[in-house]
Structures are given as C-alpha cells and as structure tokens.
Regions:
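Charged helix-capping and loop-helix junction motifs
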Residues: 44-46, 125-135
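Conserved N-terminal beta1-alpha1 strand-loop-helix module at the mouth
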Residues: 1-110, 139, 143-147, 153-164
Length: 164
C-alpha cells in the first residue's frame, strides 16, 4: 500500500518542514494542491523542500513546475482537465463517478476516486456509492490497483477500503 498525501488548499507556516518530515517518515507521494494561489508561492515552497523529494511530488496546476523542479508529474481535475501539449511523464486524474473511472483508465498512471467516504475538506462531496456498489465495480475491473480511494479515509476505515 502506498502512502499518498494531499496538501491542504492553503499555505501555512513551516509547511516545508512538515512535508520534509513526512517524506523522511515514509511518505511515498505528495500531491501539491493549492487551488487559486499564485505560482510563486508553490515555487517558494518547492525551493524549501530538499531536491531528493521532488521526484515524489505531483502538482495540481502550474504544470510548468513539473519540469522546472524535476517533479514526479501532474494531476488533472475539473479545474485543469487537459494534458499539456507534448507532455510526457506521470499523469494522475481525479474521478468522482464510476463512469469517469472507466473513461480515464488508459493514459493515466493512477486515478483518485473521491469521495469513498464523506470528504471533510469539501463538505459538498458526499459519498456516491455504497460498499456493495464499490465491491461490484471492483469485481467488474473498474476499480483496480490504478484506482486510489480518497475522502475521509482514516485509521478506523482504512481496512474497509483495503478489502474493496
């Protein structure tokens, strides 16, 4: 199982130190998600994170940062849905329905499926599918190792997610 973390949408004091500590403790991938912020703040944060961890960071927006900082890749979403022209590299995408998962399986390294449980960071994101529907999607091959669950996953329900 990979440990993937999504940053909060706003910057905060000493965020670079916390991110570095998380990488030191085994964080596999960090999704740098800072919607509605100027790129210079992302640039500043990235300069404060040791270069050895850059190859484990995926950016949501400001895609030029991928090459400038030698990052792992880019993440596509409703806000930034299109792959940049001539882009080569890691691509992940947010999906909110089983239909979106089916449509985007090819051409992506993995898909983030949200919300599996009610999402605390986005109060309007309520779980869309029952456990039974998710199990059926898994049996049908819609949900596989390329699909990563998001949405209030914690120590109390992670085993349930793993069993899907």
């Amino acid at each position: 199982m990979k440990l993937i973390l999504m940053t909060p949408p706003s910057y905060f004091v000493e965020e670079d130190k916390i991110i570095t500590a998380l990488f030191e403790e085994g964080l596999d991938i960090l999704h740098l998600r800072k919607p509605n912020t100027a790129p210079m703040y992302a640039e500043r944060l990235l300069t404060l994170i040791p270069e050895q961890y850059h190859k484990r960071i995926v950016v949501h927006g400001h895609f030029y940062l991928k090459d400038e900082f030698k990052l792992k890749g880019i993440h596509l979403s409703e806000r930034n849905p299109d792959i940049p022209e001539n882009y080569k590299g890691h691509i992940s995408r947010s999906c909110h329905t089983l239909e979106e998962l089916k449509a985007n399986k090819k051409g992506h390294d993995y898909l983030l499926f949200n919300p599996v449980f009610n999402d605390i960071s986005k109060s309007s994101y309520l779980e869309n599918y029952s456990s039974e529907e998710i199990r059926k999607a898994h049996k049908a091959g819609i949900i596989d190792k390329k699909v990563i669950a998001l949405g209030r996953i914690d120590e109390n329900n992670i085993k349930q997610v793993k069993n899907y």
